[in-house]
Each structure stands twice: as structure tokens, then as C-alpha cells.
């Protein structure tokens, strides 16, 4: 059955292609949709010069019809008067056709600024589509829906569903993010997850759920079905599907309406091509060579302290065996105790890793020799400007073609990291190939975090390592231009590494199709119990330029990336600060158990209780505030009673203990709430200026001591260690209280400096970790 569908659809594309088109006319769009079983209005296509008979119109039913011009030049018919609603009589339809034949060419020519002459437009008109006027449910917002499919250059085909009609862009801009549009991959989601992706949409609730006493206009499963059928079309004609000749670049229905409980697809457009993408994955064995080499070669090392020499020193200082370091340096016997060789060809063996630090114009000759002489299994190209400075793109292309030719012939070819990268730091590999001097960058020390950082920007990578210097990454990988190895390659490798438990990625852009590989690898990593955090830059409105469809306009590249990564279970950070906080908190919460999304909130300041409650819901999920069990309420009252706070405040969630609460009262409440069976996680927020709490290190001016066992920090440390539930702390204060924050974090508690950040993290954590 499926094969028959694909064959029938392919014939439609082939017919259009033979006429020199890469898009379908609307009658052909109807034919395609009908092939896949969609509900359509009754219609008839009249070739130019043909007018309808009365009997033909009666078969359409109804008193009115819609007449639409059909031309390969005219995609937006309404803009040029190419759509008219008239009575369903032969005379009215003929008059409408005559009117459009006269006026549409003139309007189109005028709108094009004279680029298309009226005679050319008139010649392009192939006929007119006469469609029954569908009487559909009119409920205001939500009456018209949008269903789209498009090929994202990063992720391949994606399906979009949301509000439709003429106000698509307006609604998408003004509705809260996550409530205007659902963006779904064409594969990898169960029926349950497809439905869960539609549930948050404002239009879905309006038409598929009871609304102010009105019964649903359509069953949720009906909308789920049309979305899944579009997913099927996306799979059948995907750029990744080599079994079909065509790729559906774009398919859009706007509007989709509801008639008598069934979806009916009214207006449609489609673009297609023969473009196909081969997703060529690098082998794990080759990537292991670059991350855990047994031998390293270098070129570009001068006797003076240049970039290459700094890299050599960093490699040696990280404990790599000098006897397995080979430097290409004519005229020298040794440098820094490492053997030198006159040329690449003279290297005594094929090294696992070769580091190339020459200028961009010298890269290709060295790469050619490395490849042809088979002297390296992997290469890091540090060269700055490669692929960015004008004239260097051809160098990258030459290197790609060199590798591609070897691989197609089945000959050995190295994998390449870079170019234009800062290098790699590998603890298992015992090397640091970055070119930052030791005195300018203090390597993170202390907690071995099971963390791998993969970043398109080396500077971003080092900045995050500098600010999070309490946690030592297993790997820190600056991928640069992704000339060969990509973000998807690295994630696909790291997901299977037992020493890696958290993967943090900074992404500016994916190579074509690599976003899909990244998405799949992220899903597998998360299913295996790992955590993945992503900060994605490049958020300009990519798809908002003039385009043939609304789908590309409202579902730009960043929106697609964010939506799919969230569905994979990735923690998507909106800010750099969130990115840092998420990494820190994930490391410190390792081993805590996630049971649900019920949270307990506590603060000694009323404003924080309000702000925390404001952040319970987001597009990544929601937290609920359970009522405390009676025994919990009793324990809280007992903790507050000695200070008389029980007479000032009722016990509810969030709990405001007031600035009067001392260390014992505050932490007694924390302990009671965290022990409650109704609570799955907790935010402990403290404004530390109150004299009632010990929040400062010892000094002559006061008697406080944050290091004491009975202090706030001492008590929280004990509570945190004894509970399996995730708990995060917020200290909303300035540098005076940095010692308190540092002490808490050294003892394993994740600390935030704003309560909204703390709640936002816990919301993402409790929702995404359960996937």
C-alpha cells in the first residue's frame, strides 16, 4: 500500500518536472493530498478557454463556489485578485473567470514592478480551479489552521501545526512561545508524543477540547492523524531517503478547517526537488584516535614561543610521553626534548593525531602529503582564518575533496577537527592542544564531573571552563568550522563513552543534515541516562524574508532547532548564564532521583515566593505546588513556634518563613518539606542579609560562622546529603556573600543567584529528566 502511494505521488512530481516546474499547481497539490487520504473540498479544474456547465457545478454542492486562478507564476493568488467567491451558476463562474483573465495579469505585473509583462502572465494562466465553498466551524481564533512540511537545512523534514489563515505571522509573534506553533520531526515520535506536542497549542485547546461549555469541534486523534500523515509524506520524500527520486522541499495547507468534525484541507502549495543528502558518519575508532592518541605529530613549531610551541608545551605538561611526540621541523634534532623530522614524509610512523598550526595558505600542501603518504589517522587544523577570510574557502573545499576521493575509493583518510579551532583538551588522552599559555588560563581542577564540552567557538569553551573552574571536563573540544568532523559526529561518539555523563554543546550552526544526526544522538544519550545541555546562538529571524509559504516564515532555523532538541530531552539554555548554571547543577545533582514535577518552595522574603511561583510554567514543562501533608504542616509549625513565626504566617506552598527565621527554624522547615511524600524537588531561596541567619564567614565585627555545623550552610549540607531528592539553593545577594555560595557548592549544593533562575532550572530538570 505504502509503495503504491509513493509511486502515485512520484508521478505527480514527474509530470510537473517535465513541464519545467519544481512546484505543484494547486490542482496537483489537491491530487497529492488526495493520494494520501486527506479530506478535500469537491472541485473541478477548468483548462483555459473552458467554462463550466450547470451540471458540473451541481456536483460540487452548495450555493456558492470559489474560483481560483492556476498559473505557475502566481503563488499568492489573493494578492492579485486571483480568488473570487461567487454563486454556483455557470454564468457567475464564467463572469468571474473572464474578470480574472483581464485583471490578474495587470495586477501581477504592477506588483512585480514591471518585471513580468501582462502578456506573459496571461500566457502563463493554465486554467481555473472551481471549488465548493466549504461551510466550516466559525469560532473566531482557531477556525483556520496551518499544516506545513518543510526541509530544514539542519534537521531535514519537519512538520508544523498551528493557527492559520491570514494572521499566521501575527499570531506566531504575539502568542506565548510554545503555544502558537508545534514543530515536529517526521520520525522518532510515538503517537502519544505527537499528541503531547499538540496539547500546549492555543488553537488545539480551542478546537479539540471543550471550550466554555462547547463540545470539541474535532477529536484530538483526527488532528493527530493529519499531522502524522504529513510526517509520513516527509519520510517518503525526505532528502535522507535514497529510495525515492524526489524530495518534498515544502508542502503547506493554509487554511485547514473543521467541517462536521473532520479536517478539510483548503488551500495548498508544494515545492519539490531531486536534492538528496548522504549523512556520512565518521567511525568511532577514528574519533578515538583524535581524543585518545598514542602518538602525536606537530608542524609549525618555532624555536621561539609561537602558537605551535605553546601547544607543544601544553601537550608535554599534561603528561604525554615525549618519545611519542614527533615535530616536523627541518634543521633541528630535538625541541623541548621531542624528536624533529625534516618533513611529513620522514615521520617514523603514521601518528594517531597530527596538529597543524601553519597559516591558512600552507594547510593544503601539508594535508595532501599527510593523506597521500598515510602519515596520520586524525588531524587538528588550528589555522586561523581558514574558511572565514576571503579566498580560503577554496582551501577547505580542496581538503574536503581530497578526503572524499580517498574515502570513495576505500583508501585510508584521516578525520579532521577544525579548521579555525582552538584545539582539544583530553584528560584520557593526556594532552592539551590549545594555544593558550599556562599562565593565562588556569585549568579547572577538583571534581571530576564526567563532563564533555563540545563547542564551535574555542573562546566560548575556555570562558565557560574559566567561570566553572571547580569542575574538570573529561573532554573539551573546539570543533571550529566542522570541515570534516561535526557536532553530530562528536555527540554520536560521546553518547557511548562510559566516562562521559554530561554533554554540554555550544552550537552556532549545523552542517547540512547534521542537526538530525545530533538530534538522534541526543535522544540515545538521554535514553542511556546521560544529560545533554545546549546553548544555540544564531537566533535572527532566518525564515522571515520573502518566501513562498508561511511555514518557513514562522518556523525559522532556531525555532526548529529549539523545538526538536526539547523533544529529544535536551536542556536548552536561553542565556549563557543559564548554560553555566545548568552544567553546574547537573553535575552536583548527579545521583538524585526524579519522581515527578511537584516542588516545594521556601524563602525568607515574600517577593521571592511570588517570583518563584511566576516561573512554574514554561514551554519546557510545568511544576506543580502540592499541598503539604498534615504531618509536614505540623513539623513546620513546630520549627517556627519557638520564634513566634507560626502566629504571623500560614503554612502553604510557597512557604514564606519571614526574615525572623533563624538557622534552626529555616532548615527545620526545609527538612520537613523535602521529606514530604508529595514533594519531588525543592528550591531553597534565601535573602541572607537578615541578622537571624549565619550567612557570613567568621570576622571580628560579628559572631556568625558559615562553617559551623549549626549554621544555615552546615544544616543544608546535611539535609542535601541525606536526601535522594533534587534540591537547589538560591542566594540573592552580592559579593559579600560569595563565601557562603562557594562553601555550599564545595559541599555539593547547586547555588543560583536569582530565584527565577533556580526555578527555571528545576522546571527543566524535573520535566526533561523523566523523558
Residue ranges of predicted features:
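Catalytic-core regions of core metabolic enzymes
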Residues: 1-771
Amino acid at each position: 500500500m505504502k509503495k503504491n502511494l509513493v509511486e502515485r505521488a512520484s508521478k505527480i512530481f514527474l509530470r510537473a518536472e517535465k513541464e519545467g516546474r519544481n512546484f505543484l499547481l494547486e490542482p496537483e497539490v489537491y491530487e497529492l493530498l488526495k493520494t494520501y487520504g486527506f479530506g478535500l473540498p469537491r472541485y473541478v479544474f477548468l483548462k483555459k478557454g473552458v467554462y463550466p456547465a450547470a451540471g458540473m457545478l451541481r456536483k460540487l454542492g452548495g450555493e456558492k463556489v470559489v474560483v481560483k486562478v492556476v498559473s505557475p507564476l502566481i503563488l499568492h493568488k489573493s494578492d492579485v485578485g486571483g480568488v473570487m467567491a461567487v454563486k454556483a451558476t455557470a454564468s457567475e463562474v464564467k463572469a468571474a473567470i473572464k474578470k480574472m483573465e483581464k485583471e490578474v495579469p495587470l495586477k501581477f505585473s504592477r506588483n512585480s514592478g514591471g518585471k513580468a509583462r501582462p502578456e506573459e502572465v496571461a500566457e502563463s494562466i493554465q486554467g481555473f480551479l472551481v471549488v465548493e465553498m466549504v461551510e466550516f466551524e466559525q469560532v473566531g481564533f482557531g477556525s483556520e489552521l496551518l499544516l506545513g512540511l518543510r526541509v530544514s537545512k539542519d534537521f531535514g523534514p519537519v512538520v508544523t501545526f498551528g493557527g492559520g489563515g491570514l494572521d499566521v505571522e501575527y499570531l506566531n509573534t504575539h502568542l506565548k512561545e510554545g503555544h502558537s506553533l508545534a514543530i515536529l520531526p517526521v520520525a522518532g515520535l510515538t503517537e502519544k508524543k505527537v499528541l503531547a506536542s499538540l496539547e500546549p497549542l492555543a488553537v488545539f485547546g480551542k478546537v479539540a477540547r471543550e471550550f466554555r461549555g462547547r463540545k470539541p469541534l474535532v477529536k484530538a486523534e483526527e488532528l493527530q492523524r493529519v499531522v502524522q500523515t504529513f510526517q509520513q509524506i516527509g519520510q517518503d520524500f525526505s532528502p535522507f531517503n535514497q529510495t525515492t527520486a524526489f524530495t518534498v522541499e515544502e508542502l503547506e495547507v493554509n487554511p485547514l478547517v473543521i467541517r462536521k468534525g473532520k479536517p478539510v484541507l483548503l488551500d495548498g502549495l508544494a515545492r519539490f526537488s531531486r536534492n538528496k543528502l548522504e549523512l556520512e558518519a565518521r567511525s568511532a575508532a577514528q574519533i578515538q584516535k583524535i581524543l585518545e592518541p598514542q602518538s602525536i605529530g606537530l608542524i609549525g613549531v618555532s624555536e621561539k614561543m609561537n602558537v605551535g610551541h605553546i601547544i607543544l608545551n601544553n601537550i608535554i605538561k599534561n603528561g604525554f610521553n615525549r618519545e611519542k611526540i614527533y615535530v616536523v621541523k627541518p634543521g633541528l634534532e630535538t625541541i623541548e626534548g621531542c624528536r624533529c623530522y625534516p618533513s611529513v614524509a620522514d615521520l617514523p610512523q603514521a601518528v594517531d593525531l597530527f596538529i597543524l598550526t601553519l597559516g591558512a595558505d600552507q594547510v593544503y600542501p601539508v594535508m595532501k602529503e599527510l593523506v597521500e603518504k598515510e602519515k596520520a589517522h586524525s588531524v587538528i587544523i588550528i589555522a586561523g582564518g581558514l574558511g572565514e577570510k576571503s579566498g580560503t574557502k577554496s582551501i577547505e573545499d580542496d581538503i574536503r575533496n581530497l578526503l572524499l576521493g580517498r574515502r570513495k575509493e576505500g583508501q585510508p583518510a584521516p578525520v579532521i577537527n577544525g579548521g579555525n579551532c582552538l584545539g582539544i583538551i583530553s584528560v584520557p588522552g593526556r594532552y592539551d592542544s590549545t594555544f593558550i599559555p599556562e599562565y593565562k588560563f588556569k585549568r579547572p581542577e577538583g571534581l571530576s564531573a564526567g563532563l564533555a564540552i563540545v563547542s564551535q567557538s574555542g573562546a566560548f569553551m575556555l570562558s565557560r571552563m574559566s567561570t566553572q573552574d571547580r569542575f574538570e571536563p573529561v573532554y573539551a573540544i573546539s570543533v571550529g568550522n566542522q570541515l570534516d568532523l561535526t557536532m553530530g559526529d562528536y555527540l554520536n561518539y560521546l553518547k557511548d563513552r562510559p566516562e562521559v555523563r554530561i554533554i554540554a554543546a555550544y552550537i552556532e550552526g549545523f552542517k547540512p543534515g547534521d542537526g538530525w544526526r545530533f538530534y538522534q544522538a541526543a535522544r540515545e544519550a538521554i535514553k542511556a541516562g546521560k544529560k545533554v545541555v545546549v546553548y544555540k546562538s544564531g537566533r535572527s529571524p532566518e525564515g522571515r524574508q520573502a518566501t513562498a509559504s508561511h511555514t518557513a516564515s514562522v518556523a525559522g532555523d532556531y525555532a526548529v532547532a529549539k523545538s526538536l532538541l526539547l523533544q529529544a530531552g535536551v536542556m536548552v539554555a536561553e542565556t549563557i548564564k543559564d548554560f553555566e548554571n545548568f552544567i553546574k547543577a547537573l553535575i552536583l545533582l548527579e545521583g538524585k532521583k526524579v519522581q515527578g514535577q511537584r516542588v516545594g518552595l521556601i524563602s525568607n522574603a515574600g517577593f521571592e515566593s511570588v517570583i518563584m511561583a511566576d516561573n512554574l510554567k514554561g514551554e519546557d514543562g510545568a511544576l506543580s505546588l502540592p499541598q503539604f501533608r498534615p504531618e509536614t504542616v505540623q513539623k513546620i509549625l513546630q520549627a517556627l513556634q519557638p520564634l513566634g513565626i507560626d502566629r504571623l504566617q500560614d503554612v502553604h506552598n510557597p512557604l514564606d518563613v519571614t526574615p525572623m527565621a533563624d538557622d534552626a527554624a529555616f532548615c527545620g522547615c526545609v527538612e520537613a518539606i523535602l521529606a514530604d511524600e508529595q514533594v519531588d524537588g525543592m528550591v531553597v531561596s534565601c535573602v541572607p542579609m537578615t541578622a537571624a541567619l549565619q550567612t557570613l564567614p567568621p570576622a571580628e565585627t560579628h559572631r556568625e560562622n558559615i562553617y559551623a555545623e549549626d549554621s544555615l550552610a552546615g544544616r543544608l549540607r546535611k539535609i542535601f546529603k541525606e536526601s535522594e531528592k533534587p534540591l537547589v539553593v538560591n542566594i540573592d545577594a552580592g559579593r559579600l556573600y560569595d563565601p557562603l555560595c562557594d562553601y555550599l557548592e564545595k559541599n555539593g549544593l547547586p547555588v543560583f543567584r536569582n530565584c527565577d533562575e533556580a526555578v527555571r532550572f528545576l522546571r527543566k530538570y524535573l520535566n526533561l529528566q523523566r523523558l
